[in-house]
C-alpha cells in the first residue's frame, strides 16, 4: 500500500472518530483539519474537502455548507465504522482497544 493511501485511510478514520466524540456528533471542516494536525496528519484544505466528499459518498457523514466551512455530522453507519463494528474499504479499521 502506498503511503498516500495509508494516510488517506487513516485520516478518514480520524475524522469519524473525532465526530463520535464531538457534541452533537458534528464539527466543522476547519476544526477537523486542526484535529488531524494534532495527530500529525498534515492535509491541505483541498485534501480535507476530498476526504469529506468521499465520506459523504459512502454514507458515513453528511455535510452542510456554512460560509467558508462545512458542518459535518456523522451518520449511524459512520459511527459503526468508527467503532470497528462495520468496515468500509478505504477507511482504516481501528485496532483493538483504540
Predicted features, each with a name:
Residues 42-57:
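Short amphipathic alpha-helical interaction segments
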Residues 1-26:
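Short alpha-helical segments that sit at the start of domains
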Residues 33-43:
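Short helix-coil junctions and helix-kink-helix linkers
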Residues 25-35:
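Short acidic, hydrophobic short linear motifs in intrinsically disordered regions
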Residues 76-98:
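Short, amphipathic alpha-helical interaction segments positioned at domain boundaries
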Residues 68-74:
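Minor-groove-contacting beta-hairpin "wing" of winged helix-turn-helix DNA-binding domains
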Residues 56-66:
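A short, conserved structural fragment
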Amino acid at each position: 500500500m502506498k503511503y498516500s493511501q495509508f494516510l488517506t485511510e487513516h485520516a478518514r478514520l480520524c475524522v469519524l472518530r473525532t465526530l463520535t466524540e464531538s457534541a452533537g456528533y458534528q464539527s466543522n471542516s476547519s476544526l477537523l483539519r486542526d484535529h488531524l494536525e494534532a495527530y500529525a496528519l498534515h492535509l491541505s484544505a483541498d485534501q480535507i474537502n476530498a476526504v469529506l466528499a468521499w465520506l459523504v459518498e459512502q454514507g458515513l457523514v453528511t455535510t452542510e455548507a456554512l460560509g467558508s466551512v462545512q458542518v459535518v455530522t456523522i451518520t449511524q453507519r459512520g459511527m459503526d465504522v468508527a467503532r470497528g463494528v462495520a468496515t468500509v474499504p478505504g477507511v482504516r479499521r481501528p485496532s483493538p482497544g483504540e
